[in-house]
């Protein structure tokens, strides 16, 4: 299909459309153990190994982008994602014979400009991130269907408006009339009240080396927006809103988190959502770079739920599905000839110990914070295995402080970045009594919200990234990562009935990635 498409390029080019092809190959190999527990014991005392995955991983991907440029005012773009293909895995085309079908459309949009104005519009499947500073967006950085328009009032001030539709018409309704899938409102017809829509305004202001972009976003989600399998099982390429928008710590009905016994239905047709942010970047005092970012989020309750206390069937509490909180992060760097030293930190609100008023952790749709590259989304934002990064991209319910030496270079074409960061929790230890096991704290790892940290818990992360630029468009990236586990056993190994236990361990990774860009 792709070959046939590109063969058509010369004929179309003769009609004054300039086709441009760009892309990149990634080949990744790694060794890792990314589970924070070595063994767990369930409520019956059975010892279970936590990680049965191979320690060695090898996979590849290809991103291929085709731009059809008619003029500076009109163009179209399509990006294909071939892979990721795990080497040796047949369904992904990685086994002997290599005939698997694993081609996806990553982006497909058009850019156009209103004549004689500065108004530029992009519409279609595209990547869009809310404005951020100090290491990525803690709220929203996602590909999907949207329209955004930008206008420059002058060289210093502009305005961007955006409509984004993450989900619609995924609820199958009648397929769950007996409730076997655990869907709520299963008397509703298929496709009824199942859309999620987000609307945002951004005001970028740049003056004298200072950039400030205040923004606000309002959203609505229908009461059936979460009622489909991919949402509930977090089976998305990007984002896990079943976890990051809700207070449960897990996919609804998925276990591992709050000890929920029943999800209440709601008579509401739609629930509201709201976020606001203020990212600031200051480069006035060169060689200093100062950045900070403050975010707030709120998701309206869409029904209540019942949760056991201390795993006791006779002690049931009623909880709210509301989630509301804030997060602030900052970065200060000083550029030197041989390196750029920097300190960074963050603080996010945490749960107060009660489920009655919902969660006090900041909600998000698809966060990608990259202050670090093991727990976060740093470095290449890709790895030989999905567990090698993105363990906690939201930072909700945590605080931390770190130090880094970035872009160190002692040999031509070879750079290094060293980073150390301490992660602490801001959630009340009283929340443990609502969990379904002593190891529920790890239920959100790899689901964008990392281990659930109380104020008694901590993690210490180390990153070492080495990049060798062999050619202008080809580099070799070697990364080592380690996270020391300081989860508090006294807090989590409570003597609850059938609560289980665990043996904690540190996690580590070593990955080697070859990247060719053209």
Task: Indicate where each model-derived feature is located.
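C-terminal outer-membrane beta-barrel translocator/porin domains of Gram-negative envelope proteins
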Residues: 320, 342, 348-397
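Beta-barrel outer-membrane channel/assembly domains of diderm bacteria
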Residues: 3-128, 147-161, 203-208, 214, ...
């Amino acid at each position: 299909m792709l070959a046939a498409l590109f063969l058509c390029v010369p004929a179309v080019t003769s009609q004054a459309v300039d086709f441009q092809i760009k892309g990149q190959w990634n080949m990744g190999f790694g060794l890792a153990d990314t589970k924070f527990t070595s063994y767990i014991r369930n409520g019956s005392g059975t010892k279970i190994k936590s990680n049965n995955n191979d320690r060695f991983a090898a996979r590849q991907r290809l991103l291929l982008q085709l731009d059809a440029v008619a003029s500076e005012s009109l163009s179209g773009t399509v990006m294909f994602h071939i892979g990721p293909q795990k080497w040796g895995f047949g369904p992904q085309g990685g086994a002997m014979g290599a005939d698997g079908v694993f081609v996806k459309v990553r982006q497909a949009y058009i850019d156009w400009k209103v004549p004689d104005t500065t108004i530029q519009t992009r519409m279609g499947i595209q990547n869009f991130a809310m404005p951020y500073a100090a290491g990525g967006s803690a709220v929203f950085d996602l590909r999907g269907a949207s329209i955004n328009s930008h206008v420059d009032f002058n060289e210093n001030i502009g305005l961007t408006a955006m409509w984004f539709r993450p989900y619609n018409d995924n609820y199958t309704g009648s397929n769950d009339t007996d409730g076997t899938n655990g869907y709520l409102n299963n008397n509703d017809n298929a496709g009824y009240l199942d859309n999620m829509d987000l609307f945002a305004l951004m005001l970028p202001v740049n003056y004298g080396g200072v950039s400030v972009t205040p923004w606000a976003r309002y959203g609505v989600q229908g009461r059936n927006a979460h009622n489909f399998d991919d949402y509930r099982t977090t089976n998305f390429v990007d984002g896990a809103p079943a976890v990051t928008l809700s207070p449960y710590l897990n996919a609804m009905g998925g276990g591992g988190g709050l000890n929920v016994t029943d999800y209440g239905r709601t008579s509401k047709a739609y629930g509201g959502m709201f976020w606001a942010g203020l990212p600031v970047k200051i480069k006035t005092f060169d060689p200093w770079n100062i950045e900070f970012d403050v975010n707030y989020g709120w998701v309206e309750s869409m029904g209540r739920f019942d949760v056991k206390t201390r795993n006791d069937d006779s002690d049931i509490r009623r909880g709210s599905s509301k989630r509301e909180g804030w997060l602030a992060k900052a970065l200060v760097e000083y550029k030197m000839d041989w390196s750029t030293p920097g300190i960074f930190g963050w603080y996010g609100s945490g749960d107060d110990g009660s489920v009655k008023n919902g969660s006090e952790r900041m909600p998000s749709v698809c966060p990608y914070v990259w202050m670090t590259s093991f727990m976060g989304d740093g470095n290449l934002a890709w790895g030989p295995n999905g567990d090698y990064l993105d363990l906690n991209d939201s930072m909700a319910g945590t605080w931390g402080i770190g130090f880094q030496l970035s872009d160190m270079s002692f040999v031509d074409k070879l750079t290094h970045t060293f980073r150390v960061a301490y992660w602490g929790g801001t959630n009340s230890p009283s929340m443990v009594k609502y969990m379904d096991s002593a190891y529920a704290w790890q239920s959100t790892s790899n689901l964008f919200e990392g281990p659930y940290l109380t104020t008694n818990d901590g993690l210490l992360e180390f990153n070492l990234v080495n990049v060798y630029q062999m050619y202008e468009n080809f580099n070799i990236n070697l990364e080592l990562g380690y996270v020391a586990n300081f989860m508090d056993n006294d807090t989590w190994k409570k003597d609850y009935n059938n609560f289980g236990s665990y043996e904690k361990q540190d996690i580590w990774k070593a990955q080697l990635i070859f990247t060719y860009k053209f």
